[in-house]
């Protein structure tokens, strides 16, 4: 409340500059490094996690929306993503991992760990946000690629042995989710594996029983959960004016979705994919994790 009151006192022309300054201070490397070092003292980390965390980059872009000042949560998400991939690969590994796709890469929350976990792979970092993939190219050596709202027209120009798609299905409507799955089918190399995350029963319970809204108005969130309970899928656009559509010129098709495993499997089959892995709440104890390969 105090922050909102103070914001009204600041001239409108100054607000973007002051906001950028605040974000730069919050993401200052010295601050982030201290947060990482605190996490390194966690006795529950495995030796492998500690080794990755000890070497991972501290550089967080000030526009990284995944970092809101909590370095521990930020780095834990990356460590959990590596664990997800390791579990999938223990079940179904490509012949070799030479080409790796991170879509959406954002500003590298997971990618900074992937480049350490798979040092022999060539990475493609793809995102719709201007500057995000370029940051990943500069900091982590990835090939940058710009995404688009209409995924049916996206051609990345190569096939991939392993693809990670963290928390994108969580924001797409049914049609866009199917197009994303078809994109995987087009871009997977023989034996390649696509791994993605989605909101399922856990998030539905949080909305229905705990009043969580996931940045939707309460009635929209309730409608999403109700549709999910009836059909296995629920979706609603984010409301306007929250900044979510800055990179989506159509002004729609980006919000909150709930997808049951059965619904995902039907869509994947329609896209020509076969499931090889599923774990409820596998990523950060929050999002469900799926892995698919192209049907033979």
Where are these regions (language model features)?
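A short SAM/SAH-binding and catalytic strip from SAM-dependent methyltransferases
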Residues: 162-175
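A short glycine-rich, Lys/Arg-flanked "PGG" loop and its adjoining helix->strand segment in the class I
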Residues: 178-190
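A short acidic, Gly/Pro-enriched loop at the edge of an enzyme's catalytic core
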Residues: 153-163
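Class I (Rossmann-like) S-adenosyl-L-methionine-dependent methyltransferase catalytic domain
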Residues: 8, 20-100, 106-155, 174, ...
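N-terminal accessory segments
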Residues: 1-20
């Amino acid at each position: 409340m105090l922050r909102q009151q103070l914001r009204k006192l600041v001239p409108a022309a100054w607000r973007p500059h002051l906001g950028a300054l605040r974000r730069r201070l919050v993401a200052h490397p010295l601050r982030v490094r201290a947060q990482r070092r605190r996490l390194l003292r966690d006795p529950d980390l495995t030796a492998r996690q500690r080794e990755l965390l000890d070497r991972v980059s501290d550089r967080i872009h000030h526009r990284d929306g995944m970092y809101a000042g909590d370095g521990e949560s930020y780095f834990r998400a990356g460590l959990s993503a590596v664990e997800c991939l390791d579990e999938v690969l223990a079940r179904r590994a490509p012949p070799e991992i030479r080409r790796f796709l991170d879509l959406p890469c954002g500003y590298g929350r997971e990618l900074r760990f992937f480049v350490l976990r798979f040092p022999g792979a060539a990475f493609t970092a793809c995102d719709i946000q201007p500057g995000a993939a370029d940051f990943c190219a500069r900091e982590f050596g990835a090939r940058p690629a710009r995404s688009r709202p209409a995924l049916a027209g996206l051609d990345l120009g190569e096939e991939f042995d392993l693809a990670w798609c963290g928390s994108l299905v969580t924001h797409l409507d049914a049609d866009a989710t199917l197009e994303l799955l078809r994109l995987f089918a087009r871009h997977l190399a023989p034996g390649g594996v696509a791994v993605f995350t989605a909101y399922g029963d856990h998030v539905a319970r949080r909305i229905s029983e705990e009043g969580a809204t996931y940045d939707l108005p309460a009635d929209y969130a309730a409608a999403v959960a109700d549709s999910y309970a009836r059909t296995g899928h629920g979706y609603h656009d984010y409301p306007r004016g929250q900044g979510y559509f800055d990179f989506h010129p159509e002004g729609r098709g980006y919000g909150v979705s709930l997808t049951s495993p059965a619904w995902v499997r039907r869509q994947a089959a329609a896209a020509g994919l076969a499931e090889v892995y599923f774990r409820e709440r596998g990523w950060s104890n929050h999002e469900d994790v799926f892995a698919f390969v192209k049907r033979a």
